[in-house]
């Protein structure tokens, strides 16, 4: 069972729909917060720890997987060169030409595809699309979907092929 004071998840708990749903909802909130924080970092250029601290003070984290938020935020920053290198072949624009919020979403999703193989690629794509619907431009979700659809087979070839069988 998951307790309120830990972010640990026992796979046996997934049998309980409420627990599994609660975990995924907290992860979705973590992705939303991380997207906003990455956008802020891109626009304002503040230090990562400063942005993280500000988000934790300014926002209610009771429904956020705080550990996952931190992993996403710091993981994207630490692996940004690798992330951008993976993204470039799937883009018709340069990284610099991308809308900053869509860039934040793509970097976050790419990080998950690269480093969080426990998260199914279809979940990563869906979460990226949902983030773009909320925060992106009018058709930003279509753009994000197109890029992630090209990227997933490059980064998760075996998983994508297995799913298509």
Curated annotation (Swiss-Prot):
Instruction: Could you list this entry's UniProt keywords, alphabetically sorted.
Output: RNA-binding, Transcription, Transcription antitermination, Transcription regulation
Q: Which Pfam families match?
A: NusB
| Molecular functions per Gene Ontology | RNA binding
InterPro entries given in the database record? NusB-like_sf, NusB_fam, NusB_RsmB_TIM44
Q: Where is the composition biased (Basic and acidic residues)?
A: 10-21
Q: Which family does it belong to?
A: Belongs to the NusB family.
Q: What does this protein do?
A: Involved in transcription antitermination. Required for transcription of ribosomal RNA (rRNA) genes. Binds specifically to the boxA antiterminator sequence of the ribosomal RNA (rrn) operons.
Recorded protein name is Transcription antitermination protein NusB
């Amino acid at each position: 069972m998951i307790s309120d004071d830990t972010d640990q998840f026992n796979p046996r708990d997934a049998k309980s729909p409420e627990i599994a749903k609660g975990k995924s909802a907290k992860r979705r909130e973590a992705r939303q917060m991380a997207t906003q924080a990455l956008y802020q970092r891109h626009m304002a250029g503040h230090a990562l720890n400063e942005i993280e601290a500000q988000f934790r003070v300014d926002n209610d984290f009771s429904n956020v997987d705080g550990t996952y938020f931190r992993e996403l935020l710091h993981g994207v920053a630490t692996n940004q060169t690798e992330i951008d290198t993976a993204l470039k072949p799937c883009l018709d624009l340069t990284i610099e030409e991308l809308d900053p919020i869509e860039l934040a979403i793509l970097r976050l999703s790419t990080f998950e595809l690269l480093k969080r193989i426990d998260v199914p690629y279809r979940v990563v794509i869906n979460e990226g699309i949902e983030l773009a619907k909320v925060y992106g431009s009018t058709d930003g979700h279509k753009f994000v979907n197109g890029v992630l659809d090209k990227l997933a087979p490059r980064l998760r070839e075996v998983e994508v092929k297995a799913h298509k069988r």
